[in-house]
A protein has these predicted regions:
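Generic secondary-structure transition motif, activating predominantly at the C-termini of alpha-helices
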Residues: 23-30, 140-141, 156
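Pyridoxal 5′-phosphate
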Residues: 33
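Short, extreme N-terminal segment that most often corresponds to the first beta-strand
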Residues: 1-27, 173-174
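Charged interaction segments
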Residues: 36-174
Length: 174
């Protein structure tokens, strides 16, 4: 089984059919629509119509194999939809097992963002496991921070996660 990459996608269009096409591309039934790539789980967690802008939108979360680039973008189906409908579309992904995040963005069908960043994520409960703790401290990104076995708890957020590097989910496409 491949490492799973968690992805969050936001798409906006004046055409409802464009939003439906993107949602269909992330379904598991290839007989009913095209499949965007190696997707193990996906769901639309918000969708609607913005009366102020006259645009339809959808937010989709999914687990994909390895990375968005290898599981979806290399297949080319999503790009064809982006170009066909001149979509505004943005994707963030996290793959903490391999230590990276991705950020892709298109406006009017043109790609304007294509970024990858080192990323580490661990929960305080997992730091009690010596193997997981050692793996975390041996990640390249972790070595760039003043985090040690004595102070790691101070790096945790209110939910107990330590996140180093990566991107903030700062949606540009609204």
């Amino acid at each position: 089984m491949a490492n799973l990459c968690e992805m969050d996608l936001h798409v906006v269009s004046k055409k409802e059919e464009a939003i439906i096409a993107v949602k269909d591309a992330f379904t598991f039934n290839e007989d009913e629509g095209i499949c965007a790539g190696r997707i193990y789980d996906s769901y639309v967690y918000e969708e609607g119509f913005n009366k102020e802008t006259g645009e339809y939108y959808a937010y989709i979360m999914a687990d994909v194999a390895w990375s968005v680039r290898s599981a979806i973008l290399d297949k080319g189906i999503l790009q064809k939809l982006i170009e066909k409908y001149n979509l505004d579309l943005e994707i963030y992904s996290e793959e903490p097992g391999c230590g990276f995040m991705e950020h892709f963005r298109w406006e009017g069908g043109e790609q304007i963002e294509n970024e990858v960043a080192d990323f580490a994520l661990i929960h305080l409960d997992d730091m009690e496991d010596e193997d997981l703790r050692d793996e975390f401290f041996n990640m390249t990104i972790v070595k760039k921070y003043p985090i040690t076995i004595d102070n790691y708890e101070s790096f945790a957020d209110e939910e107990g996660y330590i996140k180093l590097g990566g991107f903030d989910y700062d949606w540009v496409i609204n």
